[in-house]
């Protein structure tokens, strides 16, 4: 069985960042200081389609930069795995220039064509906030079995397209995209050591996308697709999300034959400080072994984990030879964790 290397990673965020006091939130009620402190978001970015920003254009920019920086020829990529939580695709680049909003085709086929990945099998997957981990596992499985040597993993989130800017939850989320390259490892210096996932649909309705009116509608408001957080979602999430991610981490570590003391760094999804800290405490991670990134970026759904990973690599908190755990939760609800032995990872 072949080893797997996380070879390169990059992210692309919107050009403009919105502070908590921005007029875009003028119609949102009850934005108290305690709200901001609890959720820990100070600023977040939204794609601006007027300036050509969307879930497709920015991921093309990021993927082209990664391929160029890693000296990877497009026709050498064997597989492309894409995730986008929004069901609405807004752009298809030069491939389908006249196609605008659509439900399908999804991203992988169109992006593969745009990037010139002439040999790549395109695949779309979905696990919301944990999609990056799912995609890494799928890619690693193909490489480990010898069915692929190079796999491009993409997560792109245009969540602002679904936000209800009369609801407090609109202040939490943000747009962004991430691209990673997985390759066959040449030695034992790097590998995906173990993965663990489980799910529980008991609280499926807590966070969903559904057709409805805005929470505080005007006379001209019409139903449309909005991200929707259950009215008591904060308390419901606190009843099961803090404990389930550590369960996934312990299972992954057990599969790898390791304990938490063997891990150098932890990379968590970034939904809220209280959840990240609960996950860290649940696995025995020290404060210096993980970080919070949602303050400057907002909650970028599936992009939060790769962005936090990239930040740790860029800041030197994660180094070649380190063993790391990546973990998070996904609406629905799913819980995932992975243990990686990292080699040199190109950040571009």
Curated annotation (Swiss-Prot):
Protein location: Cytoplasm
GO molecular function, a single term: 3-oxoacyl-[acyl-carrier-protein] synthase activity
InterPro entries: ACP_syn_III_C, ACP_syn_III_N, Thiolase-like
Enzyme class, spelled out: transferase
Main localization (coarse): cytoplasm
Family annotation (Pfam families): ACP_syn_III, ACP_syn_III_C
Active-site residues, Swiss-Prot/TrEMBL: 129 (acyl-thioester intermediate), 269
Effect of residue 129 to A/S: Loss of activity
Catalyzed reactions: (2-aminobenzoyl)acetate + octanoyl-CoA + H(+) = 2-heptyl-4(1H)-quinolone + CO2 + CoA + H2O
Documented EC number(s): 2.3.1.230
Result of altering residue 299 to N: Has significant activity toward the desamino substrate analog benzoylacetate
GO BP, one annotated term: fatty acid biosynthetic process
GO CC terms in record: cytoplasm
Keyword entries, A-Z: Acyltransferase, Cytoplasm, Transferase
Activation/inhibition comment: Folding of PqsC and binding of octanoate are promoted by PqsB. Binding of the octanoyl group probably increases the binding affinity of the complex for 2-ABA. Activity of the complex is inhibited by 2-aminoacetophenone (2-AA).
Complex and partners: Forms a tight complex with PqsB.
Family per similarity comment: Belongs to the thiolase-like superfamily. FabH family.
Task of the protein: Required for the biosynthesis of the quorum-sensing signaling molecules 2-heptyl-4(1H)-quinolone (HHQ) and 2-heptyl-3-hydroxy-4(1H)-quinolone (Pseudomonas quinolone signal or PQS), which are important for biofilm formation and virulence. The PqsC/PqsB complex catalyzes the condensation of 2-aminobenzoylacetate (2-ABA) and octanoyl-CoA to form HHQ. First, PqsC acquires an octanoyl group from octanoyl-CoA and forms an octanoyl-PqsC intermediate.
Name this protein carries in UniProt: 2-heptyl-4(1H)-quinolone synthase subunit PqsC
Organism per entry: Pseudomonas aeruginosa (strain ATCC 15692 / DSM 22644 / CIP 104116 / JCM 14847 / LMG 12228 / 1C / PRS 101 / PAO1)
């Amino acid at each position: 069985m072949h080893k797997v290397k996380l070879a390169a990673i990059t992210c692309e965020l919107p050009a403009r960042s919105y502070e908590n006091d921005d007029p875009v939130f003028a119609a949102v009620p009850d934005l108290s200081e305690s709200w901001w402190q609890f959720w820990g978001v100070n600023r977040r970015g939204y794609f601006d389609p007027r300036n050509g920003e969307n879930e497709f254009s920015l991921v093309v920019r990021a993927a082209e930069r990664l391929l160029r920086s890693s000296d990877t020829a497009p026709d050498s990529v064997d597989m492309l795995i894409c995730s986008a939580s929004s069901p609405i695709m807004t752009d298809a680049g030069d491939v389908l220039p006249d196609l605008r909003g659509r439900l399908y085709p999804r991203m992988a086929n169109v992006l593969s064509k745009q990037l010139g990945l002439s040999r790549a099998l395109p695949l779309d997957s979905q696990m919301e906030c944990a999609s990056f981990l799912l995609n890494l596992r799928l890619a690693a499985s193909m490489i480990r079995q010898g069915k692929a040597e190079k796999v491009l993993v993409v997560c792109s989130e245009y969540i602002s397209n679904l936000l209800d800017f009369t609801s407090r939850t609109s202040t939490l989320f943000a747009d962004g995209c991430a691209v990673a390259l997985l390759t066959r490892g040449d030695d034992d210096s790097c590998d995906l050591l173990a993965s663990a996932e489980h799910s529980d649909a008991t609280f499926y309705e807590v966070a969903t996308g559904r057709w409805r009116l805005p929470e505080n509608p005007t006379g001209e408001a019409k139903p449309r697709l909005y991200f929707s957080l259950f009215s008591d979602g904060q308390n419901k999430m606190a009843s099961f999300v803090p404990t389930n991610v550590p369960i996934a981490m312990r299972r992954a570590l057990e599969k790898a034959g390791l304990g938490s003391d063997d891990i150098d760094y932890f990379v968590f999804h970034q939904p809220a400080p209280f959840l990240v800290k609960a996950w860290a405490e649940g696995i025995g991670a020290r404060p210096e072994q993980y970080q919070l990134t949602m303050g400057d970026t907002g909650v970028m759904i599936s992009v939060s984990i790769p962005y936090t990973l990239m930040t740790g690599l860029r800041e030197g908190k994660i180094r070649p030879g380190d063993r790391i755990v990546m973990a998070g939760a996904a609406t629905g609800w799913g819980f995932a964790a992975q243990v990686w032995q990292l080699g040199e990872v190109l950040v571009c």
